[in-house]
Amino acid sequence: MEFTMNIAANHNLENKLIIITGAGGVLCSFLAKQLAYTKANIALLDLNFEAADKVAKEINQSGGKAKAYKTNVLELENIKEVRNQIETDFGTCDILINGAGGNNPKATTDNEFHQFDLNETTRTFFDLDKSGIEFVFNLNYLGSLLPTQVFAKDMLGKQGANIINISSMNAFTPLTKIPAYSGAKAAISNFTQWLAVYFSKVGIRCNAIAPGFLVSNQNLALLFDTEGKPTDRANKILTNTPMGRFGESEELLGALLFLIDENYSAFVNGVVLPVDGGFSAYSGV
């Protein structure tokens, strides 16, 4: 989009290296393509190499500089190998965006409230699968911690070095049905604050973005029926969002650019910034 491109082009990150995990996903692929307009080099890390490589090709065809790397963010040795490959191609990390994350159906309940007369086939809290819960916590929390261990070492003392984690409005108040995801994102917010303090003497800032409900291909069926009308859950969301609408990926870009550009946020550290239309601020009354 021309509008978002112009926003990104206002930030000059030339000769900086931005490393993005989960870069093949819907959200991070969009952000990566926009960040390329800052003139930064972009390293795209994802377990799905084909998805990340597609993004890299789009960036390069548009005049940017990017390369994809097949990466398992839960395998420390693999991350270290990728780090060495990136150093050969671009140098060392200046800005790390920990975008890998997600939920799992095995860690999700069917019901919002437990009741005495539930159907036997209903997946309740008591039916949540241990492996599904572990998957969600590992992917979201360890999937941010391990890349930070590897790449932050190269960022020590660098001018403008910073880390961005992707939290969620779930971190403030958990949503129904997704206890593991809500808990994992709360851990990300806590980890963000911990990192901000830990690295405060060596020049690395750490902040997080907490997206609200954004419309994407991944959640389209959850939010709208086949006729394009909001589902019951979507109506609940809209009722509890003071701005009365869903967000779009483009609306995260301004928050991200603000946090990563030290010309705008050099004294901003340890912040979890909601981009949710007021959802996390509203009590419902």
UniProtKB/Swiss-Prot annotation:
Task: Name the EC number(s).
Answer: 1.-.-.-
Family membership: Belongs to the short-chain dehydrogenases/reductases (SDR) family.
This protein's UniProt keywords: NAD, Oxidoreductase
Coiled coil: which residue ranges?
none
Task: State the active site.
Answer: Y181 (proton acceptor)
Write the protein's name. Answer: Uncharacterized oxidoreductase HI_0048
Matching Pfam families = adh_short (PF00106)
InterPro entries reported for this sequence: NAD(P)-bd_dom_sf (IPR036291), Sc_DH/Rdtase_CS (IPR020904), SDR_fam (IPR002347)
What Gene3D superfamilies does the annotation carry? NAD(P)-binding Rossmann-like Domain (3.40.50.720)
Q: Which organism is it from?
A: Haemophilus influenzae (strain ATCC 51907 / DSM 11121 / KW20 / Rd)
What's a Gene Ontology MF term here? oxidoreductase activity, acting on the CH-OH group of donors, NAD or NADP as acceptor
Which residues are involved in binding substrate?
S168
Record's keyword annotation contains NAD: yes
